[in-house]
Amino acid sequence: MNMNDILNRAQKPVIGERYTVNALELRTVEDKYNPGQTRDVLIMHTDKGAIYATSAMAKAAAEDMADAEKCLIGKTVIASEYYNTRLNRNLITFNII
């Protein structure tokens, strides 16, 4: 599975939008930045459709999905953006309220 398969099922989160998480799904995809390696992608099924999260949020869910479900399902998350100087690009993070 690659990231395009994820993008066909889930949308990129809109910055500043509030999403209520109903269910979680964890997928492993080919890493487009590191060929031959894989990365985890967390798909959050929300009240506004499916959105995806990568990096720390997906890694934490991969380590303990039961804990991720306990922390996220039924909660509202807000997507925000920050600039990562090491990667030299904007990344998305989520605030849980």
Describe these PLM feature segments.
Residues 1-97:
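Short beta-rich binding modules
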